């Protein structure tokens, strides 16, 4: 009934210009209510001044990257952005991977091993996620702000969050279906088939999946997102046939999110239908400033209701 997409600021672009571009793509075309997380990639004095205007236009959530040279912010910028968003009572979600470490590991792999999709998981170790989470939480603590860890994928990263929470730090956590259901064996599919599962953070080990499910049941995960970023195999993923680093990172998930969590979480006895509603509706609405207009069945709330048939069978297909 409602989605929050990402609008990404290009280098040299103002936040307002970026938001306008994405509104033009969605206005009159979206089949449901929508809003935007603002991805800040070019932080400067003008961007800082625009934060109040973003609030006026309904933006309550921001996205930052600690990886990707064309997207990432440095530690100083991270501190400044966290502080600026806190003044507007917004929340910052962060892609936590140490981009420099990933780049160094990748260069070493390319010099020593034959190109293969199987190098993708080797190039993005769990340590790179855990280190970035630890650094982010240190910066957030110094800034005196809460922070949202998006698409948490690893047991190591989860342990960093658990430690910070024990020390009293306010940390929100999102994970995604791919990290609860799939694991790194998908990269061992024959030929180039594993490219379909190239994403970042990458799919982890079975023990990481189990740790995340345990965190879901212990109320240590606040939201189930998707990090939806769909690509065709032919013409897009195949760009990386001769160089695994050129495989576009991303998989879809928005449409399948409820059915996947219901099947692998509720039906298989890992969690409850009430927990599913919390992760998919209640918690996101509260964190992103939409509650009680969204995320609740209350007088005056939007009548955004999903009628769920637990007996319906689904087949996920590209056809």
Feature map (PLM): residue ranges:
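Metal-associated gating/positioning segment near the N- to mid-region
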Residues: 1-29, 46
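Short, surface-exposed connector motifs at secondary-structure boundaries
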Residues: 2-4, 30-35, 59-61, 139-147, ...
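Short, ordered loop/turn segments at secondary-structure junctions
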Residues: 7-9, 39, 67, 97-98, ...
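Secondary-structure transition/capping motifs at alpha-helix termini
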Residues: 28-31, 167-169, 219, 268-272
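Active-site beta->alpha loop and helix N-cap motifs at the rims of alpha/beta catalytic domains
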Residues: 40-45
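Histidine/acidic residue-rich metal-binding segments in metalloenzymes
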Residues: 46-224, 240
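His/Asp/Glu-enriched, well-ordered alpha-helical/loop segment
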Residues: 117-144, 222-224, 230-310
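Short, surface-exposed loop/helix-turn segments at secondary-structure junctions
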Residues: 190-191, 240-244, 315-319
């Amino acid at each position: 009934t409602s989605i929050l997409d990402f609008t990404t600021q290009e280098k040299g672009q103002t936040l307002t210009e970026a938001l306008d571009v994405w509104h033009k793509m969605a206005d009159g075309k979206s089949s449901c209510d929508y809003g935007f997380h603002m991805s800040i990639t070019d932080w400067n004095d003008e961007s800082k001044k625009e934060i109040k205007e973003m609030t006026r236009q309904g933006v309550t959530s921001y996205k930052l990257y600690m990886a990707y040279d064309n997207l990432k912010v440095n530690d100083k910028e991270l501190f400044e952005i966290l502080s600026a968003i806190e003044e507007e009572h917004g929340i910052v979600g962060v892609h936590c991977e140490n981009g420099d470490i990933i780049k160094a590991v990748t260069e070493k792999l390319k010099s020593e091993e034959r190109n293969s999709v199987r190098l993708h998981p080797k190039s993005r170790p769990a340590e790179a996620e855990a280190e970035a989470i630890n650094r982010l939480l240190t910066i957030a603590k110094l800034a005196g702000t809460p922070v949202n860890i998006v698409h948490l994928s690893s047991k190591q990263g989860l342990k960093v969050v658990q430690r910070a929470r024990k020390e009293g730090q306010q940390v929100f956590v999102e994970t995604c279906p791919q990290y609860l259901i799939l694991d790194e064996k998908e990269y061992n599919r024959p030929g180039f088939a594993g490219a379909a599962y190239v994403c970042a953070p990458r799919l982890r080990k079975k023990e990481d999946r189990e740790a995340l499910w345990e965190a879901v049941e212990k109320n240590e995960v606040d939201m189930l997102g998707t990090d939806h970023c769909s690509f065709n195999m032919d013409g897009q993923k195949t760009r990386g046939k001769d160089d695994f680093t050129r495989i576009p990172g991303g998989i879809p998930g928005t449409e399948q999110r409820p059915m996947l969590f219901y099947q692998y979480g509720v039906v298989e006895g890992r969690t409850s239908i009430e927990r599913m509603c919390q992760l998919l509706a209640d918690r996101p609405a509260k964190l992103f400033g939409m509650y009680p207009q969204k995320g609740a069945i209350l007088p005056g709330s939007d009548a955004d209701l999903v009628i769920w048939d637990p007996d319906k069978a689904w087949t996920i297909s590209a056809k």
